[in-house]
A protein has these predicted regions:
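Short, solvent-exposed loop/turn elements at beta->coil junctions and helix N-caps
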Residues: 63-64
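N-terminal helix-turn-helix DNA-binding core of bacterial DNA-binding proteins
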Residues: 1-46
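Short beta-strand "wing" residues that participate in macromolecule-binding interfaces
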Residues: 60
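Basic, amphipathic "hinge/linker" alpha-helix immediately C-terminal to the N-terminal HTH DNA-binding motif
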Residues: 67-88
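Amphipathic alpha-helical dimerization/coiled-coil segments
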Residues: 81-111
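Glycine-centered, phosphate/nucleic-acid-interacting loop/turn motifs that mediate DNA/RNA or nucleotide
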Residues: 56
C-alpha cells in the first residue's frame, strides 16, 4: 500500500511510543499492527529514521540485539511524543475530510 507524504513518519513515531526498537523490528511491528496491509520498504524506512533523528523526534544508539548482533535501536524523545500528538490530530482531521467527500450528500445520486 502506498503512503501519503508524512504518514510513515507518524507510523514510526507511534510504533516507538511503546518502547525502543531497531529498524527491522519497527517495520515488523507496523506490518503486524496493520495485519500485513502495510509493508515498509527498508529503502523508505531508514531515510525516515534519519529524518526523524535529525528533527530530534527520535534518538538512536548502537546496542546488542536479542540475537547478540549489533543493532541501532531507536527511541522516541519527548519532542517526538509531542510531534506524534500533532500528527495524530492532523491525521484525524484528514480522515474526517476524506470521509465527508466520500459520503454522498443528502439527495445526491451517484452517476
Amino acid at each position: 500500500m502506498d503512503f501519503l507524504q508524512g504518514t510513515l513518519d507518524m507510523l514510526v513515531l507511534r510504533t516507538l511510543l511503546f518502547g525502543p526498537l531497531h529498524g527491522y523490528a519497527i517495520a515488523g511491528a507496523i506490518r503486524n499492527s496493520s495485519r500485513e496491509a502495510l509493508n515498509i520498504e527498508f529503502g523508505s524506512l531508514y531515510p525516515a529514521l534519519k529524518r526523524l533523528e535529525l528533527k530530534g523526534w527520535i534518538v538512536a544508539k548502537w546496542e546488542t540485539s536479542e540475537h547478540n548482533r549489533r543493532a541501532k535501536v531507536y527511541r522516541l524523545t519527548p519532542a517526538g511524543r509531542r510531534q506524534l500528538r500533532k500528527e495524530q490530530s492532523r491525521w484525524a482531521d484528514f480522515v474526517r475530510a476524506v470521509a465527508r467527500v466520500m459520503k454522498p450528500a443528502p439527495g445526491e445520486v451517484e452517476p
